[in-house]
Curated annotation (Swiss-Prot):
The modification 4-aspartylphosphate is found at residue 71. The gene is cheB. Involved in chemotaxis. Part of a chemotaxis signal transduction system that modulates chemotaxis in response to various stimuli. Catalyzes the demethylation of specific methylglutamate residues introduced into the chemoreceptors (methyl-accepting chemotaxis proteins or MCP) by CheR. Also mediates the irreversible deamidation of specific glutamine residues to glutamic acid. GO terms for molecular function: phosphorelay response regulator activity; protein-glutamate methylesterase activity; protein-glutamine glutaminase activity. This is Protein-glutamate methylesterase/protein-glutamine glutaminase. Its EC number is 3.1.1.61, 3.5.1.44. It comes from Rhodopseudomonas palustris (strain HaA2). Phosphorylated by CheA. Phosphorylation of the N-terminal regulatory domain activates the methylesterase activity.
Length: 388
């Protein structure tokens, strides 16, 4: 039996053992709701449903979960205090932080990412609002499935010389995404002939840490050119991310404002809940925020940014697709390449999830597929005139 959520790869549930999920939340209502969602999926099970971080720390070695969904605000031991203790006891544990959309919780979520959490998910203020609960369900199951791809256990026949279960890595990307060993074969395009005049970046799962690392390395690019970023992230979280990017880059960074003129020396981040597009205002490049429907199940989405920029910069676009689930950015990347621009994708080994960059690489649109720590230096050279 194959299962998939929209934007997720199909998983043959009969070939893999179910992912073991530990749900840690002080709300019995939330624990019950999430547990029912998980148990309804054939490729995952609830390994434990616990009330506090202390319960999780005391029982994680016995439970042996693959993934922990960890609430931030709990009695006895909260999520941020429990996180390092859980990872110390089970180093391969994948932790997803869960919190409501407050500034304090957004800041704590960013701290959790720096301490080793794999991702975060915003909880709805109330589960009685059906639309909000459905979005939460969709996003949660998608994250579990994609992040769990790295530890999913393939079912094998009993053998005297082999264990029942072998750990295998399954790329959380498009079904045909190539392995790390074959990535060199994907690089088939030369960089576009036009000197880049703008840097566009798209990212999702694992993106905040990747973005902070990248912008810290591209100061010479930011000083001379505008940088526009779409990170899949809700409101409040993008506000905090912009502040972190400003500190990492030591250059101005803020959420894009509708009608704002785009200038070199600044980083513009798509605000949560709005698509960020590029338009012209009085002949000058400007931000246009769009409150339309989600694109690729995301809002903000990368494709609207990528595609809209072509009318302004034509072939002078350098686009980077970083770690993330799904395939957002691939279609926009195709449009950029068709217009004479260039695309770089993060490689699988350095990605938390090789979905978005894998889709771009597999589509044959990339001029380079690089580890994260090589993308910054490459961009500095490219924007300095080195087209090799």
């Amino acid at each position: 039996m194959s299962v998939a959520l929209a934007g997720s790869p199909a998983i043959n549930a009969t070939q893999y053992e179910p992912l073991r999920v530990m749900v840690v939340d002080d709300s019995v209502v939330i624990r019950g709701l999430i547990s029912r969602w998980i148990e309804a999926e054939p490729d995952m099970v609830v390994a434990a449903s616990l009330r506090t971080g202390l319960d999780a720390v005391n029982q994680v070695e016995r439970i042996k979960p693959d993934i922990a969904l960890l609430d931030i605000e709990m009695p006895e031991l909260d999520g941020i205090a429990a996180l390092p203790q859980l990872l110390a006891k089970k180093r391969d544990l994948i932790v997803i932080m869960a919190s409501t959309l407050t500034r304090r919780n957004a800041e704590i979520s960013f701290k959790a990412l720096s301490l080793g959490a794999a991702d975060y998910i915003p909880k709805p203020e109330t589960t009685r609002e059906s639309a909000g609960a459905e979005v939460f369900r969709h996003d949660l199951l998608q994250k579990i499935r994609h992040l769990g791809g790295k530890v999913r256990r393939r079912v094998s026949a009993p053998s005297a010389s082999a264990p029942m279960v072998a750990r295998v890595r399954e790329a959380a990307a498009a079904p045909a995404a190539p392995s790390v060993a074959s990535q060199a074969a994907l690089v088939k395009r030369a960089f576009g002939p036009t000197a880049p005049r703008v840097l566009l970046i798209g990212s999702s799962t694992g993106g905040p840490q990747a973005l902070m690392s990248l912008v810290a390395e591209i100061g010479p690019v930011i000083d001379r050119y505008p940088v526009l970023i779409t990170q899949h992230m809700p409101p409040t979280f993008t506000t905090i991310l912009a502040e972190h990017l400003m500190r990492a880059a030591r250059r101005p960074a803020h959420e894009g404002v509708d009608g704002e003129l785009i200038k070199p020396g600044r980083i513009y981040l798509a605000p949560g809940g709005r698509h960020m597009r590029v338009t012209r205002q009085g002949g000058q490049p400007a931000i246009a925020l769009d409150d339309g429907p989600a694109v690729n199940f995301c809002k903000p989405a990368v494709d609207p940014l990528f595609t809209s920029a072509i009318d302004v910069w034509q072939g002078g676009i350098m686009a980077v697709v970083l770690t993330g689930m799904g395939s957002d950015g691939m279609r926009g990347g195709k449009d950029i390449v068709a217009a004479g621009g260039s695309v770089i994708a993060q490689d699988e080994a350095s990605s938390v999830v090789w979905g978005m960059p894998g889709a771009a690489a597999n589509a044959g649109i990339c001029a380079a597929v690089l580890p994260l720590n090589q993308i910054g230096p490459k961009l500095v050279r490219l924007f300095s005139g080195d087209r090799s």
